Amino acid sequence: MAVDNVNHPSHYCNNKAGIEVIEVTGNLNFDLGNAFKYLARYKSKKLPAEDVKKAVFYLNHFYANIQKLCKIVVCAEEEIPALVKKMERFCEVEDVPCIRRAMETITQAVLAEYDHLDHPLPLLSEAEWNITIADLKTYAESIADKKPEDFNG
C-alpha cells in the first residue's frame, strides 16, 4: 500500500500513542483541537518550543472565551467515549508532566461536557489553570534550543 503523504503522512502517526492526532482534534472545538494538536506533536516538529507556545496561545484563547463557546466537542455524543479513550492514550504516553497535565485538562473538559456539567472545567480552578499555563511556558523556554532528534534519541 502506498504512503499517503497528503492525507495521512506517516510522521502524523509516528508517536507513542499510535493514533493519528486528527482522530482527536477533528472532534474538538477549534481552540482545544489546536492546543491538543500542538501538545501531541511538538516533539516531532522543527521548533518544538514554538509548538508548545502555540498550544499555550490556544489554551488561553479558549479560557478567555469559555463563556461564549457553545460546544467543546463537535462529534456525536455516542462517539465521545471512544474520543476520550484516544485522548487518554496520548496522556498515558506523554512523559513530560506539564504537557500531560494540559492534555488531561482538555480531556477533563470533554468529559465535563459529556456529563452535561454546567462549567466545562469543573476540576480546574483559575489558580490551577494559571499554574498549568505557566508550567507550559517555562517548559517551552527550557526546550528552546531542542530539535526533534533530541526527543527521539
Give residue ranges: language-model regions.
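Intrinsically disordered, low-complexity regulatory regions
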Residues: 1-153
